[in-house]
């Protein structure tokens, strides 16, 4: 079930302050965030965020196509190593 339209998108307050300060200063540093649940807003376009995946901060450069998605979608938390190989086919 999606979020109600009347509530608006969820963004942590500290995240708005950090993004506003970064865009005002003109510096292109990575903004470290832990809020994977926050929605990407139009004022974040062009900024680079370091989204924490439980192990490290994954750099995410925000583009126009990302607006409306969550930050956590772009920083995977699990490493996929592929499926295990079939032991029968290895012996041949």
Curated annotation (Swiss-Prot):
Keyword NADP assigned: no
Which keywords belong to this entry?
Ribonucleoprotein, Ribosomal protein, RNA-binding, rRNA-binding
On the tree of life, the source organism's domain of life is Bacteria
Listed Pfam families: Ribosomal_S19
BP GO terms, sorted:
ribosomal small subunit assembly; translation
Q: Which GO terms describe its cellular component?
A: cytoplasm; small ribosomal subunit
Q: Which GO terms describe its molecular function?
A: rRNA binding; structural constituent of ribosome
Per its UniProt record, what PANTHER family does this chain match? RIBOSOMAL PROTEIN S19P FAMILY MEMBER, SMALL RIBOSOMAL SUBUNIT PROTEIN US19M
Family, per the entry?
A: Belongs to the universal ribosomal protein uS19 family.
Q: What does this protein do?
A: Protein S19 forms a complex with S13 that binds strongly to the 16S ribosomal RNA.
**Could you tell me which NCBIfam families the record lists for this protein?**
rpsS_bact
- Protein name per the record: Small ribosomal subunit protein uS19
> Organism, per UniProt?
Xanthobacter autotrophicus (strain ATCC BAA-1158 / Py2)
Q: What is the lineage of its organism?
A: Bacteria, Pseudomonadati, Pseudomonadota, Alphaproteobacteria, Hyphomicrobiales
């Amino acid at each position: 079930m999606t979020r109600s339209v009347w509530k608006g998108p969820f963004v942590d307050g500290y995240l708005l302050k950090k993004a506003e300060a970064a865009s005002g200063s003109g510096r292109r540093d990575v903004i470290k965030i832990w809020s994977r649940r926050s929605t990407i807003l139009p004022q974040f376009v062009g900024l680079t965020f370091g989204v924490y995946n439980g192990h490290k901060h994954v750099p995410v450069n925000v583009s126009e196509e990302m607006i409306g998605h969550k930050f956590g979608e772009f920083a995977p938390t699990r490493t996929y190593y592929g499926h295990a190989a079939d032991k029968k086919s290895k012996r041949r």
